[in-house]
Amino acid sequence: MKIDLNADLGEGCASDAELLTLVSSANIACGFHAGDAQTMQACVREAIKNGVAIGAHPSFPDRENFGRSAMQLPPETVFAQTLYQIGALAAITRAQGGVMCHVKPHGMLYNQAAKEAQLADAIARAVYACDPALILVGLAGSELIRAGERYGLVTREEVFADRGYQADGSLVPRSQPGALIENEEQALAQTLEMVQYGRVKSITGEWAMVTAQTVCLHGDGEHALAFARRLRATFAEKGIVVAA
């Protein structure tokens, strides 16, 4: 069994360099919620050095709230902003001799695109316009995955090690209790359940079916590195290969 392990990087966390030795894919902030040209260059350089797949992590234009504010923007605006961010990282990657592999939206852009078909379509269209060979990463079973499939993109369905799930397979909003799993044992057990059996227990106790093709590790958690190491070790024990 194989699983991709991804992390959001270039967002100002001191653990970026070490996380790049533990993950197989990096989602690099493109300036709209965090990061700038210099951090993008640095992350790309480290990702290439570690053989990690490089991806763009576009966001709503919301540096003040780290891309976590809901926005209602016209689809054409979202298309242009997404294309702008993807294109910037693609150029930086190409200039360093690398190849950009995937795109994963950030924060509220990701969450809204999981449920809003027009927004999902704008993102998928931007990815396709930039490079039809790019992989589109989105929440398992979401509108974003369906939009990517309509454009003929390769999609990658994502699950979260440290996030609570609702009965419909969506994430518990960060503003609600149960959104974040702080207990390491619980996060490990949830991740293995999703990867091995394709299901997750919701905060209300029901099982939700999920397709786990990539697992997100949040690099900004207090124990992010320790958890990443433990998850890698657990995967190794279970014979699960980590690869993009």
UniProtKB/Swiss-Prot annotation:
EC number per UniProt: 3.5.2.9
Transmembrane segments: none
UniProt GO MF annotations: 5-oxoprolinase (ATP-hydrolyzing) activity; ATP binding
Catalytic activity: 5-oxo-L-proline + ATP + 2 H2O = L-glutamate + ADP + phosphate + H(+)
GO BP, sorted A to Z: carbohydrate metabolic process
Keywords annotated in UniProt: ATP-binding, Hydrolase, Nucleotide-binding
Presence of the UniProt keyword Hydrolase in the record: yes
CDD domains: LamB_YcsF_YbgL_like
Source taxon at top rank: Bacteria
SUPFAM superfamilies linked: Glycoside hydrolase/deacetylase
Stated role: Catalyzes the cleavage of 5-oxoproline to form L-glutamate coupled to the hydrolysis of ATP to ADP and inorganic phosphate.
Family indicated by similarity: Belongs to the LamB/PxpA family.
PANTHER family: 5-OXOPROLINASE SUBUNIT A (PTHR30292:SF0), UNCHARACTERIZED PROTEIN YBGL-RELATED (PTHR30292)
Self-association and partners: Forms a complex composed of PxpA, PxpB and PxpC.
NCBIfam families the record matches: PRK05406.1-1, PRK05406.1-3, PRK05406.1-4, PRK05406.1-5
Protein name stated in the entry: 5-oxoprolinase subunit A
Naturally occurring in which organism (per UniProt): Escherichia coli O1:K1 / APEC
Gene: pxpA
